[in-house]
Amino acid sequence: MEGTSDKTLLLFDFDGTIVDGDIAHTLLGTTLTKEELKYVMDTGEMNYAQSMDRYCKLMSSKGKTMNDLHPILESVKFNDGIEELFNFIRENKSKYYVILITGDDLYITSYYLKYKKWYDIFDYFIGIPAFIDEKNDKQLLTIQFLPPHTCDFCDKSLCKTNEFLKFLDKNKEYKSSQIFYICDGWNDYCLSKNYLKESDFIAARKGFSFWKLMQKEEYNKNIKSQVLYWDKGQEIIDFIKKNSKV
């Protein structure tokens, strides 16, 4: 993938940032009984891949396909102003690289963005690999497990810092890009603390996990970048316009 440093890199989280809530939790909460939900989620630790693997096998045993579940994914709402932000990016795409980095599996996030007709503004997707295996009729989705990590801020399935560094190692042309990280959660703090520089910017959703961490000096002191706390997409547009080098 080609790229040059004359573009700004817009890095997006998904759950709580692009969409209101958690798309996988919406899927599970809509389709499972309390007993089934406990079974799927009781992995002993935060482990998205293991939970989704259990979920897919359970739903397959009921004869369900992804076509049965697509309407639930389609019903998830964007956060206020996110589509306006996406439209701004589309109109100015020559200035920006756009990457999604999520702890979700990439099937449900990609499906959602394709259905909402915003998939094309993204240049790259970082997340848990997942696909429909037509040869395996006993599995709804095939979830691929990434190597284990020891990060305390990320779900055990995926460390955002680890995966972003892997991406940069294969796509070195992105290393010199100024970054705007649009996010909200604990695992976003991980990447912000470990990689983002003084020349980068963070747009963290007001009132959510990242914001709560930043109210404490022990966490705040580790962030080098300037941080905006946002409620609506227009605030992010204004933040990018004011601070982007391009």
Where on the chain are the PLM-derived regions?
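Short boundary motifs at domain starts and secondary-structure transition points
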Residues: 1-3, 171-172
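Alpha-helical substrate-recognition element adjacent to the catalytic core
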Residues: 2-129
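C-terminal cap/substrate-recognition subdomain and adjoining C-terminal extension
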Residues: 9, 80-99, 104-246
